[in-house]
Amino acid sequence: AQCLVGSEMCIRDRLYNIIDRVYIGHIPEVGALALTGVGVCMPLIMILSAFAALVGNGGAPRASILLGKGDSRSAEKIIGNCFTLQILISIVLTVIMLLGGKTFLLAFGASENTIEYAVSYFNIYAIGTIFVQLTLGMNMFITAQGFTKIGMYSVLIGAVINIMLDPIFIFACGLGVRGAALATILSQGCSCIWVLHFLFGKKTTLRIKKENLRLVPKVFLPCLALGASLFIMQASESVISVCFNSSLLKYGGDVAVGAMTILTSVMQFAMLPLQGLGQGAQPIMSYNYGAKNPDR
């Protein structure tokens, strides 16, 4: 059951990104170019997600293992260190993306026709980096404790709000791609509030506590080592996407890049059930590994 909830959570998470692009593609007169511009932003957004996975997917399994051993105190040190680390990484990434965003986008496949839309979308999205990092990274610690439905709600809240705000900001307010980016970061902000409210609250097994916020290398370095493999996988996917965009822009133009954006969304959506099964099974396997119960 937990694996099925994990699959549903992944599907809902990707679904609102796809709907986001559907709205952008229907912007009058400039929809195709706007969609292509936003598509060029995807490699950078994937890199941001990779950093969230580096910390979240590295720390959450270790916390589950310690819970299985009955060492909740050490598990809370991990969640506190990972929370601090996510904030610091978010600040650094935000500065880098805001200062070098246009340069990155031009290198990643934006053309003279699409750079305006790419920059308009990404500059706003970059401001909300901290929401993305904390939502994606810290939500893993909710599912790691067995609260998979709570983790699903954090995704569902963001998805519903984003779907509601997209047409308002894009069409009613006439903000175009800027409206799509604004809707995204506001929805991620709401999800972030939900995640942190739970992790700072009393209903959770592991809480974020003030005394565990100070970074301790022997606590967070093993988490980064464990999350490095997923980070490399997602970063590699970003590099592949950049190569595709550059080649398509050279030989097929902006329309080809836009078509690849749509195709990539469909391919990612098709892979989500399997990713969700793995995400749902991870807390169970980690906990039982820590409890020395391999048969279960």
Locate predicted features:
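Short alpha-helical transmembrane segments in multi-pass integral membrane proteins
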Residues: 7, 63-130, 172-227, 285-296
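Short runs within selected transmembrane alpha-helices of multi-pass transporters and secretion channels
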Residues: 56, 125-143, 154-159, 180-195, ...
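Small-residue-rich hydrophobic transmembrane alpha-helices
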Residues: 35-95, 132-151, 259-296
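Generic alpha-helical transmembrane segments of integral inner-membrane proteins
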Residues: 11, 15, 19, 51, ...
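Hydrophobic residues within alpha-helical transmembrane segments
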Residues: 41-44, 84-88, 127, 153-160, ...
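Single conserved hydrophobic/aromatic residue that forms the stacking wall/gate
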Residues: 1-6, 11
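Hydrophobic faces of transmembrane alpha-helices in multi-pass small-molecule transporters and flippases
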Residues: 7-8, 122, 126, 149-156, ...
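Helix-terminus/linker motif at the lipid-water interface of multi-pass membrane proteins
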Residues: 15-35, 105-112, 168-174, 235-265, ...
